[in-house]
Amino acid sequence: MKIKQAIDKIPGGLMLVPLFLGALCNTFTPGAGKYLGSFSNGLITGTIPILAVWFFCMGASIEFKATGTMLRKSGVLVVTKIATAWVVALIAGTFLPGDGIQNGMLAGISVLALVAAMDMTNGGLYAALMNQYGSKEEAGAFVLMSLESGPLMTMVILGASGIATFEPQLFVGAVLPFLIGFALGNLDPDLRKLFGNSVQTLIPFFAFALGNTINLSVILQTGFAGIFLGLLVIVVTGIPLILADKFIGGGNGTAGVAASSSAGAAVATPLLIANMAPEFAPVAQQATALVATSVIVTSVLVPIITALWAKRFSPKHA
């Protein structure tokens, strides 16, 4: 059976299919983990430890070697994406209630959902698009984008906007596995290869555990809001990214469009933030479902928009 091949045809499938399977388990057999115990319970409830290993391996996979063009391009895109999410947090924090929108078609939208969906770029999608529609240097910009992985940037944004307060040690704890992996991977290429190969392998495991924190009814309730969030990510982050790429990064805007997506890893952010700041616990489940939908929407639409933009503004693709 070509199971992996079928999963790869679904945008973000490696993350979203196990996530959905986990949500199925949690909806119809919510006590399965405690009932089975042992290793099965670890797989079902082990989101945080599995993600900790994943962040370590992600750090180890990054090679600290880049040209000036790569650093300028990636730096511009990363800073612009984070700054945009921060502005959105400031505005949303002023107008949205702490527990998010509770009624109507946009029920579930919260500051946590908005920031988690917007502050992290799908680096793999970006690299693939820029390999096709840009240069090797532009494609290589995804290296710095990997630094967005994990809850750290979301913590910084929520803290800087005055929406949440985190103890200093929590920032250290959030980034330490990544930094240790990064250091080891750059000290020894063999370790980088060893741990880097595990990044993709671990995604279905933490996605399944994450899915076991979601009830399918929440996914159904937030369907339209999730689609709306995905479109919002493309428009709200895409416009500043295009302008930054053109006027600061020296590009034609294609890289900006390619970076206007939600990262698959962002699906785990609401739960991680709620684990550190309990005031977000009431909105974490809905935010997770919304961000998951946003990942699908942006994974489908961003390649199409990038191709159209490159055809219009890039001479070699005209």
Swiss-Prot record:
Sequence similarity: Belongs to the KdgT transporter family.
Location in or out of the cell: Cell inner membrane
Functional summary from the UniProt entry: Catalyzes the proton-dependent uptake of 2-keto-3-deoxygluconate (KDG) into the cell.
Gene Ontology MF terms: 2-keto-3-deoxygluconate:proton symporter activity
Membrane topology term: Multi-pass membrane protein
Key words of the record: Cell inner membrane, Cell membrane, Membrane, Sugar transport, Symport, Transmembrane, Transmembrane helix, Transport
Xref: HAMAP family: KdgT
Stretches that traverse the bilayer: 10-30, 42-62, 76-96, 105-125, 139-159, 163-183, 199-219, 224-244, 263-283, 289-309
Superkingdom classification of source: Bacteria
Catalytic activity: 2-dehydro-3-deoxy-D-gluconate(in) + H(+)(in) = 2-dehydro-3-deoxy-D-gluconate(out) + H(+)(out)
Major localization class: membrane
Protein known as: 2-keto-3-deoxygluconate permease
Gene Ontology CC entries for this record: plasma membrane
